[in-house]
Amino acid sequence: MEAFHRAYEFYSDRRVGNVMAFVCHSWLLYKPLYDEVFPKGGNLQQFYELFDVSEPHPSEKNGDFWRVFNRTYSPEALDEVVADTRMRKNLVKFLKEGKCMGYAFGIILYDGEKIINQ
């Protein structure tokens, strides 16, 4: 919460009334990853839960694969990457099942003390 408060104070000219909106467009807000890939109760799920999230948008090219494995996605890559964490193992399994990564938009409304859209 401290980071939200610091941004709230620093960007005071961007508030609407006493509310500041924080908007995010990310693969980290893609609901199927939250459900099946991110470790249960982990930081990525906690991050997701801060937001009101829009409809998920699948991306069959899996363009954010590199963010996890530092290489471009290809079906062959699934057998070559090092799946040494729960998230990496879950993502490889998820993609081998024919599912794809994607993205969504999220918003947080903060009033200077708390997130008010939860």
Language model features with spans:
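Conserved acetyl-CoA-binding loop-helix of GNAT-fold acetyltransferases
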Residues: 1-11, 22
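Conserved kinase catalytic-core segment
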Residues: 14
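Terminal substrate-recognition subdomain of acyl/acetyltransferases
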Residues: 17-118
